[in-house]
């Protein structure tokens, strides 16, 4: 059975203030999960090996209730240059109103220069469901039980 989805039902409106001179984040393809974030800096940042730096974007957002913004690495920066988001995914809660800043780290052996306008991370908007913990004396049995960290194969 083929399921038809109304595109209007798959979008979430997010209020944004752009204090940078960069374009607003946008999906690059119809099936993309994330939108690129760009650096908004007055001078280049040289990220030395193993150095970490908060990089401003000039963007401020107001998320709807029950959503979060996840800040994730860009695969090309990670693969080609060893630049990644240190606390990946970084979470922006719906009640945060400050500037979006990206915590980058250089995991390569070479210095990497970040210029203003350079795409440095992705932002993904996701639904959030709050959990209610129910304390019990023991948990039900499962096939996996307590096996973890590599227990399901190589």
Swiss-Prot record:
<dbReference type="GO" id="GO:0006226">
    <property type="term" value="P:dUMP biosynthetic process"/>
</dbReference>
<feature type="binding site">
    <location>
        <begin position="74"/>
        <end position="76"/>
    </location>
    <ligand>
        <name>substrate</name>
    </ligand>
</feature>
<dbReference type="InterPro" id="IPR029054">
    <property type="entry name" value="dUTPase-like"/>
</dbReference>
<keyword id="KW-0546">Nucleotide metabolism</keyword>
<dbReference type="InterPro" id="IPR033704">
    <property type="entry name" value="dUTPase_trimeric"/>
</dbReference>
<keyword id="KW-0479">Metal-binding</keyword>
<feature type="binding site">
    <location>
        <begin position="91"/>
        <end position="93"/>
    </location>
    <ligand>
        <name>substrate</name>
    </ligand>
</feature>
<dbReference type="InterPro" id="IPR008181">
    <property type="entry name" value="dUTPase"/>
</dbReference>
<dbReference type="GO" id="GO:0046081">
    <property type="term" value="P:dUTP catabolic process"/>
</dbReference>
<dbReference type="GO" id="GO:0000287">
    <property type="term" value="F:magnesium ion binding"/>
</dbReference>
<feature type="binding site">
    <location>
        <position position="101"/>
    </location>
    <ligand>
        <name>substrate</name>
    </ligand>
</feature>
<comment type="pathway">
    <text>Pyrimidine metabolism; dUMP biosynthesis; dUMP from dCTP (dUTP route): step 2/2.</text>
</comment>
<comment type="similarity">
    <text>Belongs to the dUTPase family.</text>
</comment>
<dbReference type="InterPro" id="IPR036157">
    <property type="entry name" value="dUTPase-like_sf"/>
</dbReference>
<keyword id="KW-0460">Magnesium</keyword>
<dbReference type="GO" id="GO:0004170">
    <property type="term" value="F:dUTP diphosphatase activity"/>
</dbReference>
<protein>
    <recommendedName>
        <fullName>Deoxyuridine 5'-triphosphate nucleotidohydrolase</fullName>
        <ecNumber>3.6.1.23</ecNumber>
    </recommendedName>
</protein>
<comment type="function">
    <text>This enzyme is involved in nucleotide metabolism: it produces dUMP, the immediate precursor of thymidine nucleotides and it decreases the intracellular concentration of dUTP so that uracil cannot be incorporated into DNA.</text>
</comment>
<feature type="binding site">
    <location>
        <position position="87"/>
    </location>
    <ligand>
        <name>substrate</name>
    </ligand>
</feature>
<keyword id="KW-0378">Hydrolase</keyword>
<dbReference type="Pfam" id="PF00692">
    <property type="entry name" value="dUTPase"/>
</dbReference>
């Amino acid at each position: 059975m083929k399921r038809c989805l109304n595109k209007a039902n798959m979008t979430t409106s997010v209020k944004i203030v752009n204090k940078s001179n960069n374009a607003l984040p946008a999906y690059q393809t119809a099936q993309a999960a994330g939108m690129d974030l760009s650096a908004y800096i007055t001078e280049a940042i040289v990220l030395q090996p193993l150095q970490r730096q908060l990089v401003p974007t000039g963007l401020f957002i107001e998320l709807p209730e029950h959503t979060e913004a996840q800040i994730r690495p860009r695969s090309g920066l990670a693969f080609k240059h060893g630049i990644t988001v240190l606390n990946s995914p970084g979470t922006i809660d719906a009640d945060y109103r400050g500037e979006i800043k990206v915590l980058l780290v250089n995991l390569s052996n070479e210095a990497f220069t970040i210029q203003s306008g350079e795409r440095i991370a992705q932002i993904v908007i996701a639904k959030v469901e709050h959990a209610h913990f129910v304390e019990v004396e023991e948990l039900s049995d499962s096939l996996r039980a307590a096996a973890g960290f590599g227990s399901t194969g190589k």
